[in-house]
Amino acid sequence: MNPYSTSPLESHHRQLGVDITDRAGWRLPDRYSSLEAEIAAVQQHVGMADLSAKGKLNLKGAFLPKFLDRVLQIQSYLPGNLTSVEFNHQKILLAALTSDEALLLTPPGQEGPVMDFLSQNLGESFVSFVDCTGGLAGLLLAGPHSRSTIAKFCALSVHPHDFPNFHVAQTSFAKVRATILRRDLGSLPAFELYFDRSYAQYLWETLLDAGQEFSLQPLGCQTVDLLLKGATEKSND
């Protein structure tokens, strides 16, 4: 029995000779280039990373807003908005898709504890949960040219006035049904895409090709960790 969960992009990462590291039971690329080169690329151009290891829970129910208010103290549930919540000293992110459906994103390996907590506090809320961590792949695009790269394939406008920070939408992306959310990393615009894992390699290669004009650089776990840490520290200042 394989003790690790695998990203749908693992074979692609290995073909490029990337060092693979274990993160919360997932095998993920440690880095594609030097840490300094990846940081410089995302600060000056655009970087792309594999987010497939993130926990992903689909929540549905007519009483979902009331349930989330009671259990996670999310008092303002608005479709199209993202809400950051602390759980066990870690940040989880709620993406309100519709009035009765949401996608809950957790750090790798935390989807189980979060789902257990929600189930234990379900009561008579008539809300259902589905762990879709293994069924959905995820990609991060961050940097000054991330918006231009995304706009090449997105059916909706990602202009800042139309799609500001902490917003989410379901749309067609390169002819693939996807959930796109914007969560900037400090001053860097950043977008996350979630979609059926069967399209992971297609979208990765499509974005790599389209991003050449913007000097797109694949990012490893080390760089993503530093970016997230820096964004968290700035938000706490």
Give the location of each predicted region.
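Basic, glycine/lysine-rich polyanion-binding surfaces/domains
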Residues: 1-237
